[in-house]
Amino acid sequence: MALATAAGGFAPLVDDIARAQERSLNPVHERYPEPQLPLAEAGGKTSPNDSLAAAIADAYATNPDLAAQRYVLRATDDEVGVALAQTRPRIDLQVSGRYDLTLPGDVTNAARPISDRLNDPNIERDELNSQLAIEQPLFTGGRAAGALRVARAQSAAGREALRGVEGDVLINLIAAYSDVRRDGRIVEIRSRNLRWLEATLDEISARREAGELTRTDLAQAETQLEIARVQLNGAQAQFEASRASFVATVGRAPGILAPEPDLPNLPRSADEAFRIAETNNPDLAAALAAQRAAEERIGLAKSEGRPVLSLRGTAGTIGPALPFVPDDQDVIFTGGATLTIPLSEGGRIRSRVAQARNEESAERLRVEATRRGVIQAVVNSWNQWVTAERNLAAQELQRKAAAIFYEGSLEEYREGLRSTFDVLFAQNSLNEAEIDLLASRRESYVARAALLRQLGLLEADRLLTNAPAYDPDAYLDRVEQRNAVPWGPVVRALDSLTAPIGKPQKVAEIESDAQTARIEEPAPQSVPGELVSSPSPQPAITVPDRVDIEGGSR
């Protein structure tokens, strides 16, 4: 029992002696750092003070592209007010004054009384006119109704365009946020690698002086050290570029960023993604609204040939201007109705209708082009997400294998079974595996955000809770209430009853003969041969003299 206790007390001393002997045989022992976990797992010592939610809230409130698009939508909504004004009364006040001085001739003087001629040989007249006119359209032939339909369709397209810009801003923000986190970690990895190589170079230099290593070992370490410096410089430049992108989108510098949170509303299958995009993609919805506006313009063009009926009443005064005496002014009241019937416009209306139909056909084709583009974008985003997730699984295994490879190479190097190059290569493999893993995590997250953008689900009010949201309808409500009159809805209802309906034309199709279509074979001489240079000498340029410039002849 006592022997066992004594043996246990000597065990630590024996271990210390063994380690001292190993250090004497291998001076580089314990100078290489142990394999480190990737930074994504090891975690930082500094607590995050910035988050994706805070960045989204700041960008939603201050991003200039998003704010500019809101004002673009407001300007589009103002067209609704312009259309509504066509059914509201128009009030004008007109005031005019006139002064006439006549130097009469013999014929005029002969007709004038002698007293007038003696009192003032000249004839002076002054007059003051004032008129208040009120005109109320009763029937515009559908012009007002058509203009209102076009304006509302344009307003709907503007709302979808605003959603699209918001999605673009958020996808840029999420990409910049992920880039800053990824590139910051890459800078840490490159810095750690540089410090490790500097320590390694010191040890190799010492061992070479001791005769244990060759000049080749030293050159290998020096080469890897300089490569590490270049890689660190590139990583730092990329990190600053990512920070600049963040500042451009958010309007402030990023802090210590927290990990990206899970994104909500992701589809469970590709088929579900296609169904959501078909009904909710803002680009497609904007194209459909623009096509509706173009269709309404057909009816608006037709309405230009319809009769217009309006009521007009005036109240005015006319009398001497100087001296102004109210009792000397005549008061005149007039009232009437005006019916205007277009009979011939020289083909202008028919041309406008044809023009509107052609524009509608173009918008309809743009809808199909947008739909195809949306499908392509959904496919690309989905596949990027799937590919990134697959790469993540493989790169997790790659990182673990690289860590084992590095640890094993280091232990074997201590035993003299591995060369300096083997250890350097293993350390570099571990670094690159960590960087590849960070890149794949970023690609996966950004691909998910890009997919949500195409589905119309990447919006601030869907991502944030209890965040103030911009309400575009508030401004439109104010536009509709400007100068509103109680009888306005009645006039609009009467005008819309007879408003013409725009009928789109059939889009002309070009027949395709894909079975017999062939690429024309080039002539033999059209095949490129040797490289050529510009001909030398260049042809001389004739400079005209002064006579030629001034238009004369030599």
Regions found by a protein language model. Name each.
Residues L13-V28, G44, L101, L438-R554:
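Acidic, low-complexity, intrinsically disordered peripheral segments
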Residues L103-A110, G146, A258-P261, R306, ...:
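Outer-membrane beta-barrel translocator domains and adjoining extracellular loop/strand segments
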Residues D126-S130, Q329-F333:
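Residues that define the transmembrane beta-barrel architecture of outer-membrane proteins
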Residues Y32-D58:
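Regulatory alphaC helix of protein kinase catalytic domains
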Residues P104-N122:
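Flexible, solvent-exposed loop segments that connect beta-strands
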Residues A57-A67, R74-R90, E124, Q131-R149, ...:
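A glycine-/polar-enriched beta->alpha junction
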Residues E22, D50, A54, E166-T279, ...:
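Periplasmic alpha-helical coiled-coil/stalk elements that build and connect Gram-negative outer-membrane
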